[in-house]
Amino acid sequence: MVMTDPIADYLTRIRNANMAKHSSVEIPASSMKKSLSEILKNEGFIRDYQVEDDNKQGMIKIFLKYGPNNERVISGLKRISKPGLRNYVSAENLPKVLNGLGIAIISTSAGVITDKEAREKNVGGEVIAYVW
């Protein structure tokens, strides 16, 4: 089966595992997914991730994070720029997610970064997803 949007699949697997309160989820690896996982870890949305090499594509194992009363840390994930309709923004028009409570993940010439980092570097790019 050909996958038309691997980033949407990545976000959906995390969303589904989070809703089912799983402790971890395995996702086929790619450099973009590693960058997204690093951002989610740095922003505190996941506990950790590890890349497992299987001499093919490899897998990323993401360890989900929950609060002290087992409440979800990730409230929502939304894919913004899709293969059929790309969404690009300039540095002046970078989005704010829930007035700064969430993050927008942007693919820029400086790499895959959050909206906050993009504002600091004054760069625009493709809006990959919102996480809150």
Curated annotation (Swiss-Prot):
One of its GO terms (molecular function) is structural constituent of ribosome. The keyword Ribonucleoprotein applies. SUPFAM superfamilies: Ribosomal protein S8 (SSF56047). Keywords: Ribonucleoprotein, Ribosomal protein, RNA-binding, rRNA-binding. One of its GO terms (biological process) is translation. GO terms for cellular component: ribonucleoprotein complex; ribosome. InterPro entries: Ribosomal_uS8 (IPR000630), Ribosomal_uS8_CS (IPR047863), Ribosomal_uS8_sf (IPR035987). PANTHER family: 40S RIBOSOMAL PROTEIN S15A (PTHR11758). Belongs to the universal ribosomal protein uS8 family. Part of the 30S ribosomal subunit. Contacts proteins S5 and S12. One of the primary rRNA binding proteins, it binds directly to 16S rRNA central domain where it helps coordinate assembly of the platform of the 30S subunit. This is Small ribosomal subunit protein uS8. The gene is rpsH.
